[in-house]
Amino acid sequence: MCFDYIDIDQFVTPNPFLDSAVAKIARGGILAVTATDTSALSGTYPRACLRKYWAMPLRNELKHEIGIRILIRKVQLIAAHHRKAAIPLLSYADQHYMRVFFSVAKGKEKADTLLKQHQYFLYCDGCMGRKISEENGGGCSCGEKYTIAGPLWTGML
């Protein structure tokens, strides 16, 4: 039995429920995911984010967008394990939670296409320079070292 709509809306991380939800979502179904562990995703506890979401967050003015992009990547990795593609339709952060709605398509080729958009976000605290990179390091043209976030979803939100 597959479902057209599954909503994961619990307290803290959605991780314990992602595998089951992705396995049971129908082709073309909508998967809604809420994360209330914003302290991890927004960079207050970066080691917790690394353990839960396999990515490093940023703690600056971009923290909510970076957190959403990390959450999207985590869902896409779980979906790819099931040969499904989780395409973000709508995402937002409000107060103490982040929420993303996905359209789920079947097919390993579609999943592989999404996985190519998992990269690193590099941020320079010196000049506020930003760039997306497949590599997780390097220095900014102003001479400062980049602060690294990710890997994360770099596609459209």
Regions found by a protein language model. Give the residues of each.
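SAM-dependent transferase fold signal centered on methyltransferase-like domains
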Residues: 1-157
